[in-house]
């Protein structure tokens, strides 16, 4: 493939991530009329991407299949994967990168100190609700959270990476991925907006970075 040839020519490895989608986990909440529409196929886009990645021999990590074995991957009132799932996803991505990076480089992992359950949502776990500008709170389901700290890996040993992704990456960026997990790295939001390692100081969310507000 063109991507593989570019990787070989530049000496820069790449990894494609297949993230889980909320519609695949909560199909019982999708409108019945939509599910019965002619030509509808469950997980069609995921299967299409997976087939092409395998066919072209591209290196990828299938987080969609991994997280299908777990519950509470998505919060009730959130768009994106749960806070705990983001931590597990980051560590899986970093572990996978270890196999393709030079031995002299390795990412820092998010070390899990403890976990707890709460009905008070944190991070992006209620970002649908926040974006709707509602006048009263929507009850949340109990969710799992981790207390974490970054593994102590010297900066010169951490690789620089380029993350090209949609808003699913914001949660990881919020946790310090660009500066603490890796070294002076960048996030290209939809391959349009370019954000560096200090973006977390701005609040690191599409709303704050691009001038949107959740306030009435």
What do these predicted ranges mean?
Residues 1-216:
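Extracellular glycan-modifying ectodomains
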């Amino acid at each position: 493939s063109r991507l593989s040839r570019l990787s070989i020519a530049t000496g820069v490895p790449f990894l494609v991530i297949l993230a889980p989608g909320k519609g695949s986990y909560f199909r019982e909440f999708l409108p019945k009329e939509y599910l019965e529409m002619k030509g509808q196929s469950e997980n069609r886009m995921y299967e299409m991407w997976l087939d092409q990645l395998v066919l072209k021999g591209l290196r990828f990590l299938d987080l969609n299949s991994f997280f299908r074995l777990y519950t509470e991957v998505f919060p009730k009132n959130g768009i994106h994967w749960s806070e705990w799932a983001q931590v597990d996803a980051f560590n899986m991505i970093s572990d996978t990168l270890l196999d393709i990076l030079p031995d002299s480089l390795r990412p820092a992992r998010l070390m899990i100190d403890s976990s707890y359950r709460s009905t008070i949502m944190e991070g992006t776990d209620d970002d649908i609700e926040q974006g709707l500008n509602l006048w009263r709170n929507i009850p949340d389901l109990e969710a799992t959270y981790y207390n974490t700290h970054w593994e102590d890996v010297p900066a010169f040993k951490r690789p620089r990476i380029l993350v090209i992704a949609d808003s699913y990456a914001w949660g990881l960026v919020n946790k310090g991925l660009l500066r603490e997990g890796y070294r002076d790295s960048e996030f290209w939001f939809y391959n349009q907006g370019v954000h560096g390692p200090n973006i977390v100081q701005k609040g690191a969310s599409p709303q704050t970075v691009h001038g949107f507000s959740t306030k009435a």
